[in-house]
A protein has these predicted regions:
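Small, basic N-terminal interaction modules of short regulatory proteins
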Residues: 1-66, 92, 96-98
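Short, compact, well-ordered microdomains
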Residues: 74-98
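Short, charged/polar, low-complexity loop and linker segments
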Residues: 67-71
Length: 98
C-alpha cells in the first residue's frame, strides 16, 4: 500500500468532519470527497459534451468522422473538435473514479 504525506493544515477539515460524525474515519471521508468531486466533474463535462452535441446535431464519434473526412479545414470546427475530444477524455477519466 502507498502512502501520501499530507500537511496537518490540509487534513484538519477532514478530522473536523469526522469529529462531528459526518464520516466514521479518514478513509471514508476522503473516499466520499473524491467520489463527490468525480460526480461533480462528470456533470460538468456531460453538460459541455451536450452543448457540443446540440451545436453540431451529432455525437462526438460522428463529428470526428465528419471533420477528418472533410476536404478543407474549417478552423472553428477543428478548434471545437479539440475541445470536444478533451471533454470526452475528461468525462471518461472521471467516470472511472465512480
Amino acid at each position: 500500500m502507498s502512502y501520501v504525506k499530507i500537511q496537518r493544515s490540509i487534513f484538519q477539515p477532514i478530522e473536523d468532519m469526522i469529529k462531528i460524525g459526518l464520516y466514521r474515519d479518514e478513509q471514508e471521508a476522503i473516499s466520499s470527497l473524491v467520489h463527490d468531486q468525480a460526480k461533480n466533474k462528470l456533470e460538468q463535462y456531460h453538460k459541455k459534451i451536450e452543448n457540443m452535441e446540440n451545436k453540431y446535431h451529432m455525437d462526438f464519434s460522428d463529428f470526428e468522422t465528419k471533420i477528418k473526412a472533410a476536404s478543407e479545414e474549417n478552423f472553428e470546427e477543428w478548434d471545437d473538435y479539440i475541445l470536444w475530444e478533451s471533454y470526452v477524455k475528461a468525462y471518461q477519466y472521471w467516470s472511472k473514479l465512480i
